[in-house]
Amino acid sequence: MWIRVLTNSDVLTGDVLSFDSASQKWIKASTLVSPLGVARTDATLKTSSITEYVVEMVMQGQVLAKASRDIPNEGGELNVENGAVYVDNAADHEGIIVPNILDASARVAGDLVTVLIR
């Protein structure tokens, strides 16, 4: 399931988002904060607007998120930096990066990787 939220024009599919109370928009997350969501589409202009952008955002379940670092084949605990995910097995929170598919190529920074948000 997804919801449509206000965002910035530079948000792309797979960006990890958090709510910014100053702008009242969902922007690229700089750290692991709760709640968080993942953009399932690129930002587009809001209907009947020339200045406001919206994005479809997933907050729970399986979704593709952008990797900020290379992701090990075994996956691991999810952490966030610069609007993207990486493995941090010292983290304790609501998400994981799933293991790589058998015989698939290595997942590198910038790739979309499957994450589970609880």
Mark where each language-model region is.
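Surface-exposed, low-hydrophobicity beta-strand/loop segments enriched in small/polar/acidic residues
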Residues: M1-R118
